């Protein structure tokens, strides 16, 4: 009987030793090359699969989003204004009077919401963004409220939007 137990112990020792020998080592974390100098005031490099922050420079700094605001404006317009895409858009003096890059809206210009979205996203038209907001939101203020609600719903809880085009005060 003792011989059988000895054989089992020896077999288990060899078996577990072999098993330990055959188990591959855990993978090493990736090694990234040093980051090049970043000229931006703030930057974040995130792993898109895991959400892990790989590198950052002033990543928590609140900054103006500039024309990236128009992306949120476009998302809301496509989600909430889909039925209005081919309808004539609202063009007000507020839209016409926007500073910066514009598509040249005029009050007598028939233009669809669909065309405004192109003008807003391809030309970065600030006037187009305001007209999109007034057409989709029913009012300028109503659309700004929609923007802030959407931002919270997608996790941008530290964001606050004051206009649909990203112009600073």
Question: PLM ranges: what are they?
Answer:
Residues 21-169:
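Active-site-adjacent loops and short helices of periplasmic peptidoglycan-processing enzymes
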Residues 1-2, 113:
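Structural motif marking the loop-to-transmembrane transition
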Residues 2-20:
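Sec-dependent N-terminal signal peptides of Gram-positive bacterial secreted proteins and lipoproteins
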């Amino acid at each position: 009987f003792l011989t059988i137990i000895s054989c089992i112990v020896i077999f288990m020792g060899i078996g577990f030793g072999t098993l330990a020998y055959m188990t591959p080592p855990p993978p090493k974390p990736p090694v990234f090359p040093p980051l090049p100098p970043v000229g931006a005031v703030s930057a974040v490099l995130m792993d898109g699969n895991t959400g892990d922050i790989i590198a950052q420079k002033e990543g928590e700094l609140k900054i103006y989003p500039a024309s990236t605001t128009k992306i949120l404006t476009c998302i809301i317009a496509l989600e909430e204004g889909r039925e209005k895409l081919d309808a004539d858009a609202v063009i007000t003096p507020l839209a016409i009077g926007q500073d910066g890059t514009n598509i040249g809206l005029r009050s007598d210009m028939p233009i669809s919401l669909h065309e405004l979205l192109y003008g807003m996203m391809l030309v970065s038209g600030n006037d187009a963004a305001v007209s999109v907001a007034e057409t989709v939101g029913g009012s300028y203020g109503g659309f700004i409220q929609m923007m802030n609600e959407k931002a919270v719903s997608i996790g941008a809880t530290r964001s606050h939007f004051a206009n649909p085009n990203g112009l600073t005060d």
